Amino acid sequence: MAVFLKSTIFAPMKEFLQILRRFVPPYKKYLGLSILFNILSAILNIFSFAALIPILQILFKVDGGIRVNEYMHWNGDWGSIKEVATNNLYYYIQEFIVVHSASTALLVIGIFLAFMTFLKTGAYFLSSATIIPIRTGIVRDIRNQIYQKINSLSLGFFSEERKGDIIARMSGDVQEVENSIMSSLDMLFKNPILILFYFVTLICISWQLTLFTILFVPPFGWFMGVVGKKLKAHSIEAQALWSDTMSMVEETLGGLRIIKAFCAEEKMNKHFNQVNSSYRDNIMRVNIRQQMAHPMSEFLGTILIVVVLWFGGILVLDYGRIDGPTIIFYLVMLYSIINPLKEFSKASYNIPKGLASMERIDKILQAEVEIKDKENPEHISSFEHQIEFRHVSFAYTDRKSAELVYVLKDINLVIPKGKTVALVGQSGSGKSTMVDLIPRYYDVQEGEVLIDGINVKDLAVHDLRMLIGNVNQEAILFNASFKDNIRFGKTDATDEEIANAAKIANAYEFITKSEHGFDTNIGDRGGRLSGGQRQRVSIARAILKNPPILILDEATSALDTESERLVQDALEKLMKTRTTVAVAHRLSTVKHADEICVLHEGRIVERGTHEELIKKEGYYKKLHDMQQV
């Protein structure tokens, strides 16, 4: 049984305490106040219930209505302090009854009981109120840590994770941590204090009865552990199914156009219903098991009360070691200790669910940050000479075979300052991967990428990326105003600087014609704009940042002719005096590049100007002729 209890009760509790050690320290002040108020609440509760004994003795005329006692001096040799205190309390009550009558004494004791209860409930409220900042603060901190971790992880991490799964962890899993683990904070900080004080009180009343009661606690705990043993495993499965549900919603929102184009609504509805039903079936099993906590603890608590009442009755009726009012007080205190024990039983169900969610959250929080500054990195504030790829190879690990799949192989390229180099080739030839190595979105496995002769791995990541501006095929905009999107990389930009950037990017006219001008919200991912408008806002953002190095990743490939003309004009203005690396699908957009590099299967197979490559009649000429058809 000891091994079973260790695996079902103590192991989850150990994990729970480890989580609290990670997140509670900033809230020690609130924790201290909560413990203080819990101690006060427990003491006041004991005193309020202790008033029941004289009330019951007066009502049922035990020992003639109240014991007849002589006053004992506190420094006399009368026995224990408990015996002296009890005797003198009854003495004062006895004297009060003689002077004022039993009914008046009953009223005064009742008022004392009500007053102590008022103080107790006030302390109880304050103990719970001081837990709330801890609970809400920890949940906020977890969400902040997840978001900050997402921003710090390399792009490679997200190529292996579904966006919907990450969203599910930040929403559903964090919510489960709040509902399951944080709701158990009361259990940890309040109930042990109550149990300790009530247990000491029970021993003081009758150590024989208390010893008898203790014998029943381990089997009850074992029985509760049997039910909760598999809860964590079921909860992990449920949260994984919730991630599948969220991932499908995210994919549907991103692919609605295709779903409608292929009349696949019914197919997608059926698939979603299957995924959603699987989640419902699993979470139903988890909740049913969880809901067993209260009725089971209620039933076991009643059995304990009945057994104690039977044994206590023997002590009263057969041995006279305890009187009736005192046994009732004992039962009241025992019932008071059962409630905290019930909370422990509920926690034994709730905590495993939260631990399952925390385990999924930690897969993000504890993921290794691959792209980070080395110790004492070199700082750079300007670009002076050249970008160089020196024997660069890049590969990723195939998830099925666990083998390295090379995307780039032995790349050697020098891009002098102020020059424009274009990368062309078929899809999958490694063009986008190559430009992603310059701002160090990924690290190379072999070779070096150098800026002014310094390996990018040796540079501070922030300094490196501040030198680079990006304009991608899909303009990445945020659900904010034109102004906020354009000044995204330069928050201190003036309105005049923002307007000038928009003019250079050919975006000023349509921005000023919008409802609120530069303060107009552009919608989720710029959904209220056309493709060309989104791209020009993206170019304005790059212009405002004013970087010496510019990366264009197929910036005009998805645009119509008119939009392409406007965007191309804006790009030419942006490229002036800048070192530019352009990934191009349409060869017509890179005819004027200083050098064109042709990639095929991860290697540079040709290089030169447009005219030189056409004359070679090689792979570039083949691509050019295909686009002329």
Predicted features, each with a name:
Residues 45-53, 57, 107, 112-163, ...:
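Juxtamembrane helix-loop junctions of ABC transporter transmembrane domains
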Residues 4-9, 374, 380-629:
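ABC-type nucleotide-binding domain
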Residues 25-29, 155-156, 172-181, 185, ...:
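An intracellular "coupling" helix at the cytosolic face of ABC transporter transmembrane type-1 domains
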Residues 1-50, 59-113, 119, 126-131, ...:
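Membrane-integrated ABC transporters
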Residues 36, 123, 127, 171-216, ...:
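Hydrophobic alpha-helical transmembrane segments of ABC transporter permease domains
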Residues 10-21, 57, 64-93, 129-175, ...:
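Extended non-transmembrane interhelical loops and adjacent amphipathic helices
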Residues 201-215, 224, 289-359, 364-365:
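Helix-loop-helix
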Residues 37, 41, 116, 186, ...:
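Transmembrane alpha-helical core residues of multi-pass small-molecule transporters
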